[in-house]
Amino acid sequence: MENFRKVRSEEAPAGDGDEGGSPSSGPFADLAPGAVHMRVKEGSKIRNLLAFATASMAQPATRAIVFSGCGRATTKTVTCAEILKRRLAGLHQVTRLRYRSVREVWQSLPPGPTPGQTPSDPAASLSVLKNVPSLAILLSKDALDPRQLGYQPPNLSPGPSSPPTVSTSKRSLGESAAGEGTAKRSQPEPEAENEDRTA
């Protein structure tokens, strides 16, 4: 593929075998009409997504939000959902994982110019259909059915405003390790002394 460059990437239309039905319904077909759908992409900024999501969930009319992403955006999708769960306590979560079809269009690169040759053929293109993992995370203020697959109850642990207990012990361990590292670096190495004497 070194002689090709990617021109565009688009989501292929969902077939009958797709788990979630039509692409508009997503994996959560029984959502209320007022639910917010956040489509996370590889180039999305987390702070922009969370600013909109937090403002939307602050409204009393909004009861649920769905973060969805596919391919390389799945890690960013999980990050957004976890940060929002920390900011807003008491959110119920359902996670769905599936595969989506993505069509990539590649165009051949023109060969290097040779003296006396004119380009006669237009660039050839190649279409590739890939199955990529897709993740959808539903966060709801209302209680969800705990028997459905992928359900997580609200987190009852303390939020970010309370003082951490485990982190302090890790910090103290890290400080002692950092102190040992600086003490070791301050001692001159025997080879370095020999080089200084010969120079």
UniProtKB/Swiss-Prot annotation:
Family membership: Belongs to the histone-like Alba family.
Cystine crosslinks: none
Phosphoserine found at: 172
Main function: Component of ribonuclease P, a ribonucleoprotein complex that generates mature tRNA molecules by cleaving their 5'-ends. Also a component of the MRP ribonuclease complex, which cleaves pre-rRNA sequences.
Organism taxonomic ancestry: Eukaryota, Metazoa, Chordata, Craniata, Vertebrata
Biased composition (Acidic residues): 190-199
Major localisation: nucleus
Superkingdom in the source lineage: Eukaryota
Cellular component terms per the entry's GO annotation: centriolar satellite; multimeric ribonuclease P complex; nucleolus; nucleoplasm; ribonuclease MRP complex
Subunit relationships: Component of nuclear RNase P and RNase MRP ribonucleoproteins. RNase P consists of a catalytic RNA moiety and 10 different protein chains; POP1, POP4, POP5, POP7, RPP14, RPP21, RPP25, RPP30, RPP38 and RPP40. Within the RNase P complex, POP1, POP7 and RPP25 form the 'finger' subcomplex, POP5, RPP14, RPP40 and homodimeric RPP30 form the 'palm' subcomplex, and RPP21, POP4 and RPP38 form the 'wrist' subcomplex. All subunits of the RNase P complex interact with the catalytic RNA. Several subunits of RNase P are also part of the RNase MRP complex.
GO biological process: rRNA processing; tRNA 5'-leader removal
Keyword line: Nucleus, Phosphoprotein, RNA-binding, rRNA processing, tRNA processing
Protein name: Ribonuclease P protein subunit p25
Region named Disordered: 1-31, 146-199
Gene3D superfamilies xref list: Alba-like domain
Naturally occurring in which organism (per UniProt): Rattus norvegicus (Rat)
Gene Ontology MF annotations: ribonuclease P activity; ribonuclease P RNA binding; RNA binding
Compartment annotation: Nucleus, Nucleolus
InterPro entries, per database record: Alba-like_dom_sf, Alba-like_NAB, DNA/RNA-bd_Alba-like
UniProt feature, compositional bias: Basic and acidic residues: 1-11
Keyword Ribonucleoprotein: no
